[in-house]
């Protein structure tokens, strides 16, 4: 049997149960070994973070299933959470994480790119409302929001302020 990323993805999707979902999968096949890296998404958690217990449970169940593929399939399995500062999937995560802080890479008038902190507002059509976030003024009520075309956002991450 050929052990492909697609075979492994199908197995993972059978093992996962809501509210857990597959966030990302990377499989690195070497001569007699595969490195399988899985990131989980927790669909009902505020930041989408899967717990350590969730990761352990999924890891155990996947290992049991992968062990049934036979001794000739040697693998290393790593299961983790996508995390509280995960990469955003645009545009869907802009809706999902509305109200949270994000670090977005956005264009400046000069044509250069800049990473800035924003609080996500509502998505309307092809634009999202963003409130520039400044730690010094975070409690002021008169912070101005801007509407930015989603297509202009190069990339982003959730941002966790501690």
Curated annotation (Swiss-Prot):
Belongs to the RimP family. This is Ribosome maturation factor RimP. Required for maturation of 30S ribosomal subunits. HAMAP family: RimP. InterPro entries: Ribosome_maturation_RimP (IPR003728), RimP_N (IPR028989), RimP_N_sf (IPR035956). Its main location: cytoplasm. GO terms for biological process: ribosomal small subunit assembly; translation. Transmembrane segments: none annotated. It is found in: Cytoplasm. It comes from the Bacteria. The gene is rimP. The keyword Cytoplasm applies. GO terms for cellular component: cytosol. Keywords: Cytoplasm, Ribosome biogenesis. It comes from Leptospira biflexa serovar Patoc (strain Patoc 1 / ATCC 23582 / Paris). SUPFAM superfamilies: YhbC-like, N-terminal domain.
């Amino acid at each position: 049997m050929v052990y492909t990323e697609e075979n492994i993805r199908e197995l993972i999707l059978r093992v996962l149960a809501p509210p857990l979902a597959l966030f990302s999968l990377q499989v690195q096949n070497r001569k007699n070994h595969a490195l399988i890296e899985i990131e989980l998404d927790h669909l009902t958690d505020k930041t989408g973070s899967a717990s350590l217990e969730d990761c352990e449970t999924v890891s155990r169940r996947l290992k049991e299933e992968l062990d049934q593929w036979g001794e000739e399939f040697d693998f290393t399995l790593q299961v983790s959470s996508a995390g509280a500062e995960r990469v955003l999937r645009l545009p869907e995560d802009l809706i999902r994480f509305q109200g949270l802080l994000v670090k977005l890479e956005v264009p400046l008038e000069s044509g250069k790119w800049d990473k800035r902190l924003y609080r996500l507002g509502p998505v309307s059509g092809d634009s999202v409302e963003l409130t520039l976030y400044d730690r010094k003024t975070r409690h002021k009520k008169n912070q101005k929001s801007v509407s930015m075309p989603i297509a202009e956002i190069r990339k982003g991450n959730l941002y966790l302020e501690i």
